């Protein structure tokens, strides 16, 4: 799998099952929460003794977070940016999984990520930290479980777009796709 098996996040798009549960992706708490247990700047490093003591996923887990992050994004400029990008990474990983599971409807009819909250201030799979602060994952999950989902996935050279509805009645709509550059400029077709 993606976390324990160290597979790429994109592997979520190829997993098949009738029901998914207890899958997840770790992140640290947000910076304001971290400062409550690591108040000194010398501890603001994922390898510091304090940060390692607030990691219950094993000695390799902080390294794994960093490895995934650097595979997906540029190296963050500082510790605070690292925490922020780690939240984006966690959110994107879970969004990828949930959307993939929902696209498999009606073969797959359930998906429960791990986990909602923490019982201690720690790096974990939770979408809300010990202090109740929402991580990016919490926002991503809320959107990924919308009753109407528009989801895209790259398969080879193709971009496939899916519409998934959990509504009991038929729904119609109009979908407009645009390709944009990173600066937001729309690419003409």
Q: Residue ranges of each PLM-predicted region?
A:
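Intrinsically disordered, low-complexity Pro/Gly/Ser/Thr-rich segments with frequent PxxP/GP/PP motifs
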Residues: 173-189
């Amino acid at each position: 799998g993606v976390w324990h098996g160290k597979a790429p996040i994109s592997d979520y798009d190829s997993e098949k099952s009738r029901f998914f549960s207890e899958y997840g992706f770790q992140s640290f708490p947000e910076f304001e929460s971290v400062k409550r247990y690591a108040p000194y700047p010398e501890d603001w490093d994922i390898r510091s003794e304090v940060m390692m003591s607030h990691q219950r996923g094993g000695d390799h887990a902080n390294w794994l977070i960093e490895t995934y992050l650097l595979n997906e994004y540029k190296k963050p400029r500082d510790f605070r940016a690292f925490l922020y990008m780690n939240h984006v990474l966690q959110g994107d990983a879970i969004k990828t999984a949930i959307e993939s599971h929902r696209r498999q409807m009606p073969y797959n009819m359930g998906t429960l990520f791990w986990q909602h909250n923490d019982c201690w201030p720690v790096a974990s799979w939770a979408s809300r930290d010990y202090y109740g602060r929402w991580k990016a994952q919490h926002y991503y999950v809320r959107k990924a479980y919308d009753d109407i989902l528009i989801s895209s996935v790259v398969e080879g050279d193709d971009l496939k777009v899916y519409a998934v509805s959990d509504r009991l009645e038929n729904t119609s709509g109009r979908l407009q796709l645009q390709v944009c550059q990173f600066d937001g400029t729309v690419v003409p077709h």
